[in-house]
């Protein structure tokens, strides 16, 4: 939580409240904002979290009444989210845009590897004990993402003659990539789930920011010069980007429990 949020939060104020609708209970995170003039609700599609923004002088009682009044809205939005796909045996996960079925092979050596059967079906195999399957798959995907993103970013940087200070790969929920004025590039590891042309476009986009830290026409010309098929990648992200956030989530829908 940021220091600004702590500044506006009252000492005894809860960080979240519960909203009941039909047979489900939803956990709603409270967030005060100094510029808020009214109570607002939103669903974070990436984290599957319900967030209620409050005015500085708003009360928890009013926030609870507001959220409960909109319980049907919350439930409807959750139903529209794609089903969670945990990293577990039998689940299909895309790797560079190609579906791979997770296969747990408890007795085998190694950690995670890919293979293709005689019918051309792709598998993402993981060894070890069942409790470690989720973490091992996640670690593997993050390593693959870093490898691809570093290779693509450094290739584009070489073409422009610019220097990357550092490359960070993490689970960013709000942006697929970013570039700081100090030359640090940050990316979401989930780009490894998308087709390779999407990852390549994001790498070109952020490297272009090392020259033009804006979204001016000159910036977009630079992106097109580095990656001529940028529009195709942008369209893919607009259509399918939200879906990438469902992988690796627990089977229970975020924020909702049956009562």
PLM segments and residue spans:
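Active-site-proximal or metal-binding-adjacent scaffold patches in catalytic folds
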Residues: 1-201, 210-259
